[in-house]
């Protein structure tokens, strides 16, 4: 390009860049100028703003319309909505052909492919952009795409998830004040948590990353996906109050997205049913319950009764049989509980498998079992022993509803002894996390 021509083009590109930046600022900072009640209009308002911006850009472009930078900015403007735009794909494809080093065009084209559902093509764009220039946007996008790539084996998927965490960490390192990088790091930890057997340390890392996203970027608090993903983690961690709050907030921020409202409703229905069954001890008649409890035998403790139980620390310990009512919150080391199943309850997600346990002391506690295969379960009348039980006390208030109950969390069915028998490895499975396939 000649020097004079370059001088002529520069102010035009600058003006186009300003218009596109304003458009994205309108979308990303929508709730700074609108109330949450306007959330249902957001997509419509962004669409109108996009049309207005494209018209203004057309007036500015003039003779430079075929230049790669102009094609990229026009494609980026068209790409502001959550929907796939064939026109954006066409313009951005031309831009990268004309100027292969134009990293922002590769990033935008990758997002277009992502919206189109072509995850492999999106992956190629983001990886390609990084070969030209290491940048946080490509790293962020690569992190989220890696978690969605089709894989043939569980190992391959785990490898992609680990790689996703690495890319997100690199993005954070490039700019610790970028809320999107922290949010995507939180999502990659969320996937890692579900693909590697629910390590509490990883869930803490996910929650910390989400908190950091909100701390460094005020826009993060208006991101419905952040609230839904964090609520999913809270639900799995049995922090039900925080989970309900998160689902409710996500629903308010994106009323057209049905999932948060459904998840909130499902959790409320689960808590309604659970507390009702706990209060009525599964509606088992008093006489029948006495007969069930009268049939409990020391033999039902199985391997928990012979001093050969191996604790989490790997040491052989002798367990002491304790009534449910004497348990303390947290892990009760050196103790074992034994009771009868009076009801069972499954949710839409099938995890956890929840049942009510009663012992001769009287109270009914919920037992939540994680990492189960779908076919696993216990029946009413089964005797269940739980070594070193982990007790949770729940006090939940949400939208005028109050719930209060005690539960025992069991990370795997392998820890349970049912009717005197330990559970085989075929009873254990790994949980997975589902997310909507869109740019984060």
From Swiss-Prot:
Gene Ontology terms for molecular function: chromatin binding; DNA binding; ribosome binding
GO biological process: cellular response to starvation; DNA damage response; DNA repair; positive regulation of mRNA catabolic process; positive regulation of transcription by RNA polymerase II
UniProt motif Nuclear export signal: location: 13-24
Cellular-component GO terms for this entry: cytoplasmic vesicle; cytosol; mitochondrial matrix; mitochondrion; nucleoplasm
TPR repeats: 7-61, 68-98, 103-130, 136-174, 179-216, 224-253
Induction or repression: Induced upon heat-shock stress (at protein level).
Connected disease: Neurodevelopmental disorder with cerebral atrophy and variable facial dysmorphism: An autosomal recessive disorder characterized by global developmental delay apparent from birth, moderate-to-severe intellectual disability, poor or absent speech, and hypotonia. Most patients have variable dysmorphic facial features. Brain imaging shows corpus callosum agenesis, mild ventriculomegaly, simplified gyral pattern, and cerebral atrophy.
Protein name: Tetratricopeptide repeat protein 5
């Amino acid at each position: 390009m000649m020097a004079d021509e370059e001088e002529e083009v520069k102010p035009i590109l600058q003006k186009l860049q300003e218009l596109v930046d304003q458009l994205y600022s309108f979308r990303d900072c929508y709730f700074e100028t609108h109330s949450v009640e306007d959330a249902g209009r957001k997509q419509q308002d962004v669409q109108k703003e996009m049309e207005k911006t494209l018209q203004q850009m057309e007036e500015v472009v003039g003779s430079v319309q075929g230049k790669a930078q102009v094609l990229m900015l026009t494609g980026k403007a068209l790409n502001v909505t959550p929907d796939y735009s064939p026109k954006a794909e066409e313009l951005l494809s031309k831009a990268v052909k004309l100027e292969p080093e134009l990293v922002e065009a590769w990033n935008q084209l990758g997002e277009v492919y992502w919206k189109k559902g072509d995850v492999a093509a999106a992956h190629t764009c983001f990886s390609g952009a990084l070969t030209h220039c290491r940048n946080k946007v490509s790293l962020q996008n690569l992190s989220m795409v890696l978690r969605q790539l089709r894989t043939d084996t569980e190992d391959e998927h785990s490898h992609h998830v680990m790689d996703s965490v690495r890319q997100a960490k690199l993005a954070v390192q490039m700019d610790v004040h970028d809320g999107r990088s922290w949010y995507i790091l939180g999502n990659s930890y969320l996937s890692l948590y579900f693909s590697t057997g629910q390590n509490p340390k990883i869930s803490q890392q996910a929650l910390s990353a989400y908190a950091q996203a909100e701390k460094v970027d005020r826009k993060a608090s208006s991101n419905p996906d952040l609230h839904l993903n964090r609520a999913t983690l809270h639900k799995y961690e049995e922090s039900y109050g925080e989970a309900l709050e998160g689902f409710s907030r996500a629903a308010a921020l994106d009323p057209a997205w049905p999932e948060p409202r459904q998840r909130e409703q499902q959790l409320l229905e689960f808590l309604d049913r659970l507390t009702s069954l706990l209060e009525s001890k599964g509606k088992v008649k008093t006489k029948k319950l006495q007969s069930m409890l009268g049939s409990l035998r020391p033999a039902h403790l199985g391997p928990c009764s012979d001093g050969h139980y191996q604790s989490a620390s790997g040491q052989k310990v002798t367990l002491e049989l304790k009534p449910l009512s004497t348990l303390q919150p947290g892990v009760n080391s050196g103790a074992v509980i034994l009771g009868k199943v009076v009801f069972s309850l499954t949710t839409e997600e099938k995890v956890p498998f929840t049942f009510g346990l009663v012992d001769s002391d009287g109270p009914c506690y919920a037992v939540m079992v994680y990492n189960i295969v779908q076919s696993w379960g216990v029946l009413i009348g089964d005797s269940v022993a739980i070594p070193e039980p982990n007790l949770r006390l729940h006090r939940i208030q949400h939208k005028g509803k109050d719930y209060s109950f005690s539960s025992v969390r069991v990370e795997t069915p392998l820890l349970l002894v049912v009717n005197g028998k330990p559970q085989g490895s075929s009873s254990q499975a790994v949980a997975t996390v589902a997310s909507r396939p869109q740019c984060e």
